[in-house]
């Protein structure tokens, strides 16, 4: 083993950088009162301390700073946590709803003037984590979460107002829409008429290879360290973001309330999803048009707070509720009102069959798998060739025609170490400053690498991929940093569950792998009762029919809101630059102001 490796290197978490734009320590300020005594010596004991406000670091600051690649988990937990959920539930009364002939409406009372509507969205990876922890099915884990967030024995059993969440939706519904739109995006890119990624001129389409953008850790890494990657990122919102946009748009219009009075909680497997929720691109400013009336001028987030599966345990514990004692059955209709817009209610009921959520789809939503299945269905007789990489988190796929010609080439890269290899492949060649010199040819692999028998060929530069599914966590989203760990399960369940090992003992790598395998198994499993019903529906619809149905629902959403679909489903990315290490003198600041004033036609 190399001497530079240590146990600290055996994970993909990248610690925060030492240069932060929001330092928590401050130096004594310059004394501006006696500038004429430029050579006066002042000792440390004569410096008068000042009462400065405590430093505060917001997630927006983290996104605007390139000092860190990712953010410390402690910062993320302190800013969006189960405590914020409880504080918000106790700070605002719940807007009462009334059942009307056309659906659900707002009951105009004092609470409706000051209150909020609480909604939540839950990812399937979180349900799988809970299912593994409590030894139940993924479907029962969903019932457990519903009972906690909305039922009488959950959050509603305590607090100042006895509030709970009116609607709890599955992010799989919006994921189905994202999968269809992803295949459309790849098709449009391939049909753009250009064979080279570097020569694509349509700014509305990402450059090939299109890289998935649902992982916020990967997006944060690309924006801060490799801006040349940004043109390759898929423009689609993640299922979390799209769920927030859907809930805020439809509920605000159908119930006649401002988006700021709809509070959306997302329960996700990853701490970095908190960063995604804080992006300024994912607010109502991206889709709300012409609404300049009223005093609400601040952008309203589509997702107000994100907690993880592990924090869900803390949420229940803080309310004095035991998850294992909650009923594993659907909510009573009195705690589960119908969605106010009936035409769009079917959108939230989209589910996946076992065939669509299998080992081949992966644990991160199946973006790549859906693209491959779509193109294989469009090319009858084609064959999918799978080439394994140097580890289980790198896989290359080639769709071959019956004549043996490649139709589509795609890949999957999980984990930051593999992502760095992908980035090196896509890095543009260095341009020589000498006049007339040709660009340097970058080696495909970047460095000498031994080839194994089953390794993916590194002869390509990576630009011949049509699509790459990229996730920051090794193993995918079921291995997210916010998932319930072995030691968390031991502490939660206690010795009564038959754990022979001490709860304080650190689990071995073998135990951790076995635990993750159980989470994956729960993620891929479905209840047998619902399986038969869903499979009969699935067999009746071809892939093209399913896509047409989802497109129809997306059009209905756009028409109902009178907002172009592009404003609802697409987002943007930006290069993140900070002033760390740059000249911050007043003279430099003045020159920058003069330059800016000249550009906008101003000046003195």
From Swiss-Prot:
Keyword Transmembrane helix included in the entry's annotation: no
Pfam families, per the entry: Fe_hyd_lg_C
Top-level lineage group: Eukaryota
GO MF assignments: 4 iron, 4 sulfur cluster binding; iron-sulfur cluster binding; metal ion binding
Alphabetized UniProt keyword annotations: 4Fe-4S, Iron, Iron-sulfur, Metal-binding
Entry's Gene Ontology BP terms: iron-sulfur cluster assembly
Biased composition regions of type Polar residues, renumbered to the chain: 451-461
Residues noted as binding [4Fe-4S] cluster 2 in the record, renumbered to the chain: 215, 270, 473, 477
Region ranges (Disordered): 434-461
Residues the record lists as binding [4Fe-4S] cluster 1: 20, 62, 65, 68
Sequence intervals crossing the membrane: none
Entry-linked InterPro entries: Cytosolic_Fe-S_CAF, Fe_hydrogenase, Fe_hydrogenase_lsu_C
Known role: Component of the cytosolic Fe/S protein assembly machinery. Required for maturation of extramitochondrial Fe/S proteins. May play a role in the transfer of pre-assembled Fe/S clusters to target apoproteins.
Family according to the record: Belongs to the NARF family.
Protein name, as recorded: Cytosolic Fe-S cluster assembly factor nar1
Originating organism: Penicillium rubens (strain ATCC 28089 / DSM 1075 / NRRL 1951 / Wisconsin 54-1255) (Penicillium chrysogenum)
Gene name of the record: nar1
């Amino acid at each position: 083993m190399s001497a530079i490796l240590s146990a600290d290197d055996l994970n993909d978490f990248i610690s925060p950088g030492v240069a932060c734009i929001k330092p928590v320590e401050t130096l004594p300020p310059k004394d501006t009162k006696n500038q004429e005594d430029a050579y006066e010596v002042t000792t440390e004991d004569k410096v008068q301390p000042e009462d400065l406000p405590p430093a505060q670091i917001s997630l927006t600051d983290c996104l605007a700073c390139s000092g860190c690649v990712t953010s410390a988990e402690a910062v993320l937990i302190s800013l969006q946590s189960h405590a914020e959920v409880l504080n918000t539930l106790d700070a605002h009364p719940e807007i009462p709803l009334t059942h009307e002939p056309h659906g659900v409406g707002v009951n105009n009372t004092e609470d409706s003037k000051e209150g909020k509507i609480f909604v939540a969205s839950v990812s399937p990876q979180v349900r799988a984590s809970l299912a593994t922890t409590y030894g139940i099915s993924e479907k029962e884990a969903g019932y457990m979460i519903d009972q906690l967030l909305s039922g009488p024995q959950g959050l509603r059993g305590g607090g100042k107002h006895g509030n709970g969440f009116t609607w709890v939706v599955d992010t799989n519904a919006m994921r189905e829409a994202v999968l269809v739109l992803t295949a459309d995006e790849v098709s449009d890119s391939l049909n753009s008429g250009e064979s080279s990624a570097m020569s694509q001129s349509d700014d509305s389409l990402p450059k090939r290879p299109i890289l998935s953008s649902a992982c916020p850790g990967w997006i944060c890494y690309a924006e801060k360290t490799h801006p040349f990657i940004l043109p390759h990122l898929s423009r689609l919102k993640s299922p979390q973001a799209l769920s927030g946009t859907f809930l805020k748009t439809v509920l605000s219009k159908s119930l006649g309330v401002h988006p700021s009075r709809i509070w959306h909680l997302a329960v996700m497997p990853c701490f970095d999803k908190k960063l995604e929720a804080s992006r300024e691109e994912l607010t109502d400013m991206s889709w709300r048009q012409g609404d300049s009336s009223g005093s609400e001028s601040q952008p309203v987030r589509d997702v107000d707070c994100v907690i993880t599966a592990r924090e869900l345990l803390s949420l229940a514990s803080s309310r004095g509720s035991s998850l294992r004692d909650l009923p594993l059955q659907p909510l009573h209709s009195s705690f589960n009102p119908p969605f106010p817009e009936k035409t769009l209610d079917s959108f939230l009921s989209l589910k996946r069959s076992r065939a669509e959520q299998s080992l081949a789809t992966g644990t991160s939503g199946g973006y790549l798998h859906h693209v491959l299945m779509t193109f294989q269905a469009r090319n009858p007789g084609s064959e999918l060739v799978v080439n394994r990489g140097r580890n289980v988190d790198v896989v290359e796929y080639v769709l071959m025609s019956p004549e043996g010609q490649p139709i589509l080439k795609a890949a999957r890269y999980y984990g930051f170490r593999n992502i760095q290899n992908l980035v090196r492949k896509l890095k543009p060649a260095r341009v020589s400053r000498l006049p007339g010199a040709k660009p340097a040819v970058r080696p495909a692999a970047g460095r000498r690498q031994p080839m194994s028998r089953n390794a993916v060929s590194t002869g390509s530069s990576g630009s011949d991929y049509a699509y790459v599914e990229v996730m920051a966590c090794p193993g995918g989203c079921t291995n997210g940093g916010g998932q319930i760990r072995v030691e968390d399960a031991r502490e939660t369940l206690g010795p009564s569950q038959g754990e022979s090992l001490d709860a304080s003992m650190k689990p071995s790598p073998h135990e951790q792998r076995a635990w993750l395998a159980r989470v994956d198994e729960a993620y891929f499993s479905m209840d047998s009762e619902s399986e038969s019903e869903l499979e009969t529906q699935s067999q009746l619809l071809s892939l093209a029919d399913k896509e047409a149905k989802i497109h129809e629902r997306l059009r209905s959403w756009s028409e109902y809101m009178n907002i172009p679909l592009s404003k609802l489903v697409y987002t943007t990315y930006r290069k993140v630059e900070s002033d760390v290490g740059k000249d911050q003198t007043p003279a430099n600041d003045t020159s920058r102001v003069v330059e800016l004033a000249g550009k906008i036609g101003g000046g003195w």
